[in-house]
């Protein structure tokens, strides 16, 4: 009988690819690699007992198909001019997502697209003279751009009431309002999409182990030793992998740290929680059919942009408003209250201190949000829906976000980032994704960037297949309107977005 302890690692398995986390990012990369290298073996590890239970879960995010059609933080006003470059860039990336999803639907990898994507108009909303002027200027800057065609503008009571009856009821129209509207927006259930990806993965031979938490990643020559613990039995085992992707949400940074790669030195994470108001009145839910985004309060961070959102989840319409910010030291919704404190290292203390000194507005915003009760949250909703009643809404907890803090030189020492950040080692054998919005909406673009950075020597070989999956690969649709029109028509049909 062996003298080894009960929980000692068992005989090492091997895999070409280990994917950590059963969310939208890992499942997207897995699907992409199965298209490009179907002979590569893949193993997915997920600490929870099912897929898409953290940020990919449909009620843990707003489900916006982030194409910058309505999100005002992507079109800042600088010296009196609305800048659209970021919006165009995000829209380009969302077109890549549509093409990739369409290819997988055509290939039978993704099944019924209506389970995960549905047409919902995207609307930008402004109230008060300054915001109305901004909405008008934003509309003028975007309306003739090929990627934003079909956008309309209105600032009259009749049109507003026709399109947004819930928001019009009880409103004092002596205070000016304006909307820009585009019918071709979408609502996306990333949880359902993740499940479709992983169902197909299992059929194609990918091993998915739920209830397994990755505890460490260590280099072994050119490969990686991944130590995994069964959360139910306590047993541990090790897997040797050629490539590791850390798609573990808020836990990604610490896992990348355990791998010892220098590229994460000085990086830190700042956790931000969120709350939604979810409508419980079916009559009200049926009266609203749009995702309506407004402007964040002065001094508030981009994550606080308020929106009144139609959702389509498992074929049923829903309605939410938020998000309301909050704070907890947990890095995952199902994480530990010690997460933040465990993440502090000597090399990232300057980053934390630098951000603490610079981000007074964020601190003030979070304190204010944490102190809000239901009545205060309802007051914020009434700026959008004047006759909202407390009894028609319940508070639910959204997914946990960990904003990236990047190291910086003197005098800042650290900078708080509000997008997504891809980190990989110089050899391209391990990578991870950090950060938040626009996140899931641009997962295919993020994973293509990963392929280019980690598998650069294979990109020529993969070129034809990538163009088969994503016909606009290597091109900018903004400068090729004919290709955009062709792919738009194709994806509208394939994803069943033309159907009512």
From Swiss-Prot:
It catalyses: (S)-malate + a quinone = a quinol + oxaloacetate. Activated by lipids. Its EC number is 1.1.5.4. The FAD is tightly bound. The keyword Iron does not apply. GO terms for cellular component: plasma membrane. GO terms for biological process: tricarboxylic acid cycle. This is Malate:quinone oxidoreductase. It comes from Corynebacterium glutamicum (strain ATCC 13032 / DSM 20300 / JCM 1318 / BCRC 11384 / CCUG 27702 / LMG 3730 / NBRC 12168 / NCIMB 10025 / NRRL B-2784 / 534). The gene is mqo.
């Amino acid at each position: 009988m062996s003298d080894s302890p009960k929980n000692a690692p068992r005989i090492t398995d091997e895999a070409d690819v280990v994917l950590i986390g059963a969310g939208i990012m890992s499942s997207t990369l897995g699907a992409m690699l199965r298209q490009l290298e179907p002979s590569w073996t893949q193993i997915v590890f997920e600490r929870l007992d099912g897929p898409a239970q953290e940020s990919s879960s449909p009620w843990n995010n707003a489900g916006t198909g982030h194409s910058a059609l309505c999100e005002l933080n992507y079109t800042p006003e600088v010296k009196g001019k609305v800048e659209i470059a970021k919006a165009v860039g995000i829209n380009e990336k969302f077109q890549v997502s549509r093409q990739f999803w369409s290819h997988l639907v055509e290939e039978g990898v993704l099944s019924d697209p209506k389970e995960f994507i549905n047409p919902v108009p995207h609307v930008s909303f402004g109230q008060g003279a300054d915001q109305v002027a901004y909405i008008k200027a934003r509309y003028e800057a975007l309306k003739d751009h090929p990627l934003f065609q079909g956008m309309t503008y209105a600032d009259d009571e009749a049109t507003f009431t026709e399109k947004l009856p819930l928001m019009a009821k009880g409103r004092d129209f002596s205070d000016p309002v304006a909307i820009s509207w585009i019918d071709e927006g979408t609502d996306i259930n990333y949880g359902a999409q993740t499940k479709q990806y992983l169902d197909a993965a299992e059929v194609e031979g990918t091993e998915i182990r739920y209830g397994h938490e990755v505890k460490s990643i260590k280099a072994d020559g050119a490969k990686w030793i991944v130590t995994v613990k069964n959360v139910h039995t306590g047993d541990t085992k090790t897997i040797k992998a050629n490539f590791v992707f850390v798609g573990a949400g808020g836990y990604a940074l610490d896992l990348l740290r355990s791998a010892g790669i220098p590229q994460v030195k000085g990086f830190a994470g700042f956790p931000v929680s969120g709350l939604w108001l979810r409508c419980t009145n079916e009559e009200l839910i049926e009266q609203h059919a749009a995702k309506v985004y407004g402007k964040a309060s002065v001094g508030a961070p981009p994550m606080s942009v308020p929106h009144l959102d139609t959702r389509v989840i498992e074929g049923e319409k829903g309605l939410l408003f938020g998000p309301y910010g909050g704070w907890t030291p947990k890095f995952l919704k199902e994480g530990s209250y010690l997460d933040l404190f465990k993440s502090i290292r000597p090399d990232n203390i300057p980053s934390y201190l630098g951000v603490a000194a610079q981000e007074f507005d964020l601190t003030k915003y979070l304190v204010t949000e944490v102190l809000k009760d239901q009545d205060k949250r309802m007051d914020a909703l009434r700026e959008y829906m004047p006759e909202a009643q407390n009894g028609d809404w319940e508070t639910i907890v959204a997914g946990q976000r960990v904003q990236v803090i990047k190291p910086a030189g003197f005098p800042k020492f650290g900078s708080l980032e509000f997008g997504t950040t891809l980190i990989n080692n110089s050899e391209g054998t391990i990578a991870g994704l950090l950060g938040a919005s626009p996140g899931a909406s641009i997962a295919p673009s993020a994973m293509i960037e990963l392929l280019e950075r980690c598998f650069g020597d294979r990109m020529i070989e993969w070129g034809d297949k990538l163009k088969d999956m994503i016909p606009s690969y290597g091109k900018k649709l903004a400068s090729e309107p004919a290709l955009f029109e062709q792919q738009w028509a194709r994806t509208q049909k394939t994803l069943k977005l033309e159907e009512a």
